[in-house]
A protein has these predicted regions:
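Membrane-interface transmembrane-helix boundary segments in multi-pass integral membrane proteins
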Residues: 258-262, 331, 424, 542-552, ...
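N-terminal signal-anchor module of multipass membrane proteins
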Residues: 291-362, 366, 703, 707, ...
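TerminUS-proximal long segments
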Residues: 469, 639, 643-728
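Alpha-helical transmembrane segments
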Residues: 270-284, 325, 367-368, 440-441, ...
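Membrane-interface helix-loop junction between the first two transmembrane segments
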Residues: 32-41, 283-294, 327-343, 372-375
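Long, contiguous internal "core" modules enriched in hydrophobic/ aromatic residues
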Residues: 292-324, 377, 415, 419, ...
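Membrane helical hairpin/interfacial module
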Residues: 344-408, 425-432, 436
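Non-ligating segments of multi-cofactor redox enzymes
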Residues: 1-292
Length: 728
């Protein structure tokens, strides 16, 4: 929200660093007004008068101590005291990040927080360019803490008496104005803090600079930085020497606004395009099938292998370890059970989710390839891809429950209407996609256990469900009735045109929904990091990062389908259909090629190759591109190489690991974690035993349940089963 778009005056505080005497009266007043406990402090020689070291859940305002060079001062140095607190951006990144409007900007300036709406995702902590929000890690239900610009003081009722004497109307208003002033400003004895409208504070700042050019640098920090803030600074030394980050004028939420604003029309466009592709390819394939009398019928049956094997017992032990870790996370609390901190609010579990979602993309890729593009030669691996996708996304949801600080507030995702929140889009999109995966897989148990009526109902009504689900998604994301109606028309028309006319009808609407929703959430996982150009290295950050995430997921998901099919053949001693896998490898080749060309082309257009290969991050980037991209691209480049099982395995493994490494770099390795304002103390991060336990347990559960489902239901083709001896 720009100043021009504001509905009225913006309440603003001007901080004059040149006048601050470091008394910390503001710091004490802030604690008193917000009823925050004191915290144990330590004398640290490099911090001087600064105590505590950083902002925290109990310290919203902090006076930071700086020693700056000044040849004219005794000893060649002078002290500068800087008030650190929330800057209350005019276009706050934390508000753009919040998926539930727990963080929201008031029309007159303050960025406020409502704990009752917070789900504890901590995305705001990473998104804030000033590193202000903190979590109460000592609590079993860690909430976000930050300065609210004393917005609650304005809500205080008008006083009607003072010291037992009734007040006149003018006196009451004067006292009310005094109360409404932020506690820190009221406590300042040195004319270092002023409070008023933004226009008044800018005028006063310019007056002071003009009156004393020898005392101030000609820069009002916060006037234009990232679109402007409601807290402005004056200083006698350059702000960079005081640790202030150097930012341009463009607010970071502008990046996500562009990306997420394209989602509603993209949903309609992708759905319509997929419907057109299906109509074209179905007609062409039908003609070929009628001429050859080959309609590609494939039979499935349960795997005839014993469940009690050493391998499965190991999986059960790991699952028990994961279950114990999951319970421990809630008994101990998020802070005590993990090594997460204000420096690293996201850790192994978020990394785990981003990697898992990327490599599980094979489910939507195979659905689109088999049904939309009518590749019936790949129909035999469709069920395994969908089952693995269903299990993977289900356990991603479990991981998110463990990672959320307040998971019992998740219902707020259905009640709030945040503006341009990538987290909100991902949450709804993934949730709806899980239901699509479930509907795609349900015909398998229905066929196994003879639920013919349920199967008929699913076949008849899945199109209507898809139209309703996608329309709901578009409305929730845009809050635009026109977009919602247009989406209903597009997907309703597709559902009617492709409605089931017999028992052999294809679930094309589910396939269209799978591809559409996956396109949106795979790309929006990249949108999560559009708010962090100040943290993510330029080799990975890009305004088109969402497209890069989507393209790379296709390559990784397709490659994982190959690895799973090879694992099935090896683990259960099944025949390996190299012809079929070579065809999947060809899809992986083109997906990987498009991804690499797009990503490297984007870097070239933005001029990011200069220095891209230098330093440790340069080596990481080179390894990701070379080993995870170019090498598998070469190995998948020809049919002869793809039909060699060993080379196909290596190429697929490298492609999966390359995309996984890309997500690791984006989440952790290529990020600059500075800690909380004023960036003097940054903790290290090593995942705890509980974090590892939950992650390992869920991986084991995925593998075990996949094997269990294959034994109980017709997941594998009849050609893949037989009387071969059990391997494991």
């Amino acid at each position: 929200m720009s100043e021009a778009a504001a509905t009225g005056p913006i309440r603003t505080t001007l901080i004059d660093i040149a006048n601050c005497i470091g008394c910390r009266a503001c710091q004490v007043a802030c604690k008193q007004w917000n009823e925050k406990d004191g915290e144990q402090t330590f004398l640290e020689s490099d911090l001087g008068f600064q105590n505590p070291a950083t902002l925290s859940a109990r310290t919203y305002t902090l006076i930071a101590f700086h020693e700056v060079e000044n040849p004219a001062s005794p000893g060649g140095a002078e002290s500068a005291f800087v008030m650190q607190r929330c800057l209350h951006c005019l276009e706050p990144a934390c508000v753009s990040a919040c998926p539930t409007t727990a963080l929201h900007r008031q029309a007159d300036g303050p960025v406020s927080y409502d704990a009752d709406e917070c789900i504890g995702c901590r995305y705001c902590q990473l998104a804030c360019p000033w590193d202000v929000p903190t979590s109460d890690w000592n609590s079993h239900a860690p909430k976000i803490s930050k300065c609210t610009h004393c917005a609650d003081r304005i809500e205080q009722p008008l006083p009607i008496a003072f010291n037992g004497q009734a007040l006149s109307g003018d006196e009451s208003k004067r006292f009310s104005g005094s109360i409404a002033t932020p506690a820190c400003v009221k406590a300042c004895p040195a004319d270092a803090l002023l409070y008023g409208t933004r226009e008044e504070m800018l005028t006063e700042a310019r007056r002071r600079i003009a009156a004393r050019p020898d005392k101030y640098v000609d820069h009002i920090y916060g006037e234009k930085e990232l679109g402007g803030t409601s807290v402005l600074y004056l200083s006698r030394v350059p702000f960079a020497k005081l640790g202030f980050p150097t930012y341009g004028e463009k607010p970071f939420p502008a990046f996500t606004k562009t990306a997420l604003g394209a989602v509603p029309p993209a949903v309609m466009a992708v759905g319509a395009m997929l419907g057109a592709f299906y109509a074209f390819f179905r007609k062409r394939v039908q003609k070929v099938a009628d001429a050859s009398h080959d309609h590609g019928h494939v039979e499935f049956e349960p795997l005839q292998h014993a469940l009690s094997t050493p391998f499965n017992w190991v999986l059960l032990v790991l699952m028990a370890f994961g279950a114990i870790s999951f319970v421990a996370r809630f008994i101990m609390g998020l802070g005590a059970s993990t090594n997460l901190s204000d420096t690293y609010p996201w850790g192994l579990w978020i990394l785990f989710d981003l990697v898992w979602i990327a490599v599980a993309a094979g489910a939507f890729v195979m659905a689109g390839v088999i049904y939309v593009f009518q590749r019936k030669d790949l129909y035999g691996i469709g069920r395994t891809a969908v089952l693995m996708g269903l299990l993977s996304y289900s356990f991603v949801t479990v991981t998110l429950i463990a990672d959320l600080g307040l998971p019992w507030h998740a219902y707020q995702l259905a009640l709030q209407a945040p503006e341009h929140s990538a987290m909100f889009e991902v949450s709804w999109c993934v949730g709806l996609y899980v239901t699509i995966l479930l509907l795609e897989f349900l015909p398998v148990p229905f066929a196994r256990y003879g639920y013919t009526r349920a199967a008929d109902a699913l076949r008849q009504w899945n199109g209507a469900y898809v139209a309703a689900a996608v329309t709901l998604f578009v409305y929730l994301l845009s809050r635009n009735v026109f977009y919602a109606l247009a989406t209903a028309v597009v997907f309703g028309t597709l559902a009617w045109v492709f409605r089931a006319r017999d028992h052999h009808a294809e679930p094309v609407m589910l396939a269209i929904a799978a591809v559409t929703l996956s396109t949106m959430h795979q790309s929006s996982l990249g949108s999560l990091y559009l708010l962090m150009p100040n943290m993510l290295a330029p080799q990975w950050w890009s305004p088109v990062l969402p497209i890069s995430f989507f393209l790379s997921s296709i390559a990784a998901g397709t490659a994982l389908v190959i690895l799973i099919d090879m694992w099935i053949a090896k683990g259960w001693r099944r025949p390996l259909d190299l012809t079929r896998l070579a065809s999947v490898g060809q899809i992986a080749f083109w997906a990987l090629l498009v991804y690499l060309v797009f990503r490297l082309g984007d870097m070239a257009v933005r001029g990011q190759f200069n220095g891209a290969f230098s330093g440790s991050l340069g080596l990481a980037f080179a390894a990701e591109i070379l080993l995870g991209g170019i090498v598998p691209l070469i190995l998948l480049g020809t049919r002869a190489l793809r039909k060699r099982a060993d080379l196909l395995f290596i190429a697929s493994l490298l492609a999966v690991l390359g995309v996984a490494y890309n997500r690791m770099n984006v989440v952790l390795f290529a990020m600059t974690f500075r800690g909380r304002m004023p960036w003097d103390v940054a903790e290290n991060y090593v995942p705890s035993i509980v974090e590892w336990g939950v992650s390992i347990g869920l991986i084991a559960a995925t593998i075990f349940l996949f094997g269990l489902a294959a034994r109980l239901m017709p997941v594998l083709t009849r050609a893949q089963t037989g009387d071969a001896a059990l391997s494991r």
